[in-house]
C-alpha cells in the first residue's frame, strides 16, 4: 500500500513588493536564461505563509542538472538577517506557468533550508493578459520498502498589502494607460498631504452614499437584508464617538492645524538640506 505524507494545509499571502522584485529580476535576466528563480523570505504562523521579501538566485539549467550559486544565496540571506531577523526562508519562486523537471531538484535544496517550503510561480509571459500566480507544496509519495518521489500540489495563494503598500499601489494605478495616451504624463508624483485628505474625503463620501442607498433599499423592501452587512454597519455605528457637530468640527480643525504644522516643518527641513548641499558644493569648488 502506498503512503502519502501531506504537509499542513497552507495559505500563501504574497506582498506586492515580492511580485515587483520577481518581475524586476526577470527583466534583468541574462539573454540565455529561460526563467529566473530565487528565495522567498517571510514568516509562517498558524498555517499561513506570509511572504514579505525575496531575492534572486543566479543559476543555469542544463538537460540533466542544475547549477546554482548557493554560496551567493547563503551570503545574501545572512546579510538580510542583519537587517530584518524576523524574515526567514519559507520557500522559493520561479518565473513561468508550470512546474518543470528541474523543480524537484531545486525544491530538495530548499527542503534542507526550511520545513515544508512553498513554491511560487509567476507567469511573466502574461498569458491571457494576466500575470498568473500559483503556489505549491511538495507532497511525498512512496511505497514502503520501495522507491519514493514527490508531487507538487497547488495550495491557496492570495495577494495582501500593508497600508503603506496600498498607498503605493494606488499611485501606481494612476500610470495605467500612459502608453496608450501620449498626452498623459509618464511620471506621477505623490499628492500633497492636504490633497490626500481631500481625496480620502471624496472616497469616504462615495462609500457613505453606497451604504445609504443599501439601507434605503432594505427599508423599502427592494433588496433582501444580509445579516453580515447589518452587523458590520452596527459595529461601524458603535465605533463612532458620540459628539455634537461643533465638537467634531473643533477636533477636525485641530487635526488639520497639526497637519499644517508638520507640513511647514517638513518644508523648512527640506529647504535647509538643499541650502546645506549647495553651500557644501560651493565650498568644495572654492577649495
From Swiss-Prot:
GO terms for biological process: formation of cytoplasmic translation initiation complex; translational initiation. The keyword Cytoplasm applies. It comes from the Eukaryota. Its main location: cytoplasm. PROSITE patterns: MPN. Keywords: Cytoplasm, Initiation factor, Protein biosynthesis. This is Eukaryotic translation initiation factor 3 subunit F. It comes from Anopheles gambiae. The gene is eIF3-S5.
Amino acid at each position: 500500500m502506498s503512503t502519502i505524507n501531506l504537509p499542513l494545509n497552507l495559505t500563501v499571502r504574497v506582498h506586492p513588493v515580492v511580485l515587483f522584485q520577481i518581475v524586476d529580476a526577470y527583466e534583468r535576466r541574462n539573454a540565455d536564461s529561460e526563467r529566473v528563480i530565487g528565495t522567498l523570505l517571510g514568516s509562517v504562523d498558524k498555517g499561513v505563509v506570509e511572504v514579505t521579501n525575496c531575492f534572486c538566485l543566479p543559476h543555469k539549467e542544463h538537460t540533466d542538472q542544475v547549477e546554482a550559486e548557493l554560496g551567493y544565496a547563503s551570503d545574501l540571506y545572512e546579510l538580510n538577517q542583519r537587517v530584518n531577523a524576523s524574515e526567514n526562508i519559507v520557500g522559493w519562486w520561479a518565473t513561468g506557468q508550470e512546474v518543470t523537471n528541474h523543480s524537484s531538484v531545486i525544491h530538495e535544496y530548499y527542503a534542507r533550508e526550511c520545513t515544508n517550503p512553498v513554491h511560487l510561480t509567476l507567469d511573466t509571459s502574461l498569458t491571457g493578459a494576466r500575470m498568473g500566480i500559483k503556489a505549491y507544496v511538495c507532497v511525498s509519495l512512496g511505497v514502503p520498502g520501495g522507491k519514493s518521489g514527490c508531487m507538487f500540489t497547488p495550495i491557496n495563494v492570495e495577494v495582501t498589502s500593508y497600508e503603506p503598500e496600498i498607498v503605493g499601489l494606488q499611485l501606481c494605478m494612476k500610470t495605467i494607460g500612459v502608453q496608450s495616451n501620449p498626452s498623459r504624463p509618464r511620471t506621477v508624483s505623490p499628492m500633497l498631504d492636504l490633497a490626500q485628505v481631500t481625496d480620502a474625503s471624496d472616497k469616504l463620501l462615495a462609500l457613505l452614499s453606497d451604504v445609504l442607498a443599501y439601507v434605503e433599499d432594505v427599508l423599502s423592501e427592494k433588496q433582501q437584508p444580509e445579516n453580515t452587512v447589518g452587523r458590520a454597519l452596527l459595529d461601524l455605528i458603535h465605533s463612532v464617538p458620540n459628539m455634537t457637530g461643533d465638537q467634531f468640527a473643533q477636533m477636525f480643525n485641530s487635526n488639520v492645524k497639526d497637519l499644517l504644522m508638520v507640513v511647514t516643518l517638513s518644508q523648512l527641513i527640506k529647504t535647509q538640506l538643499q541650502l546645506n548641499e549647495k553651500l557644501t558644493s560651493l565650498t568644495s569648488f572654492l577649495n
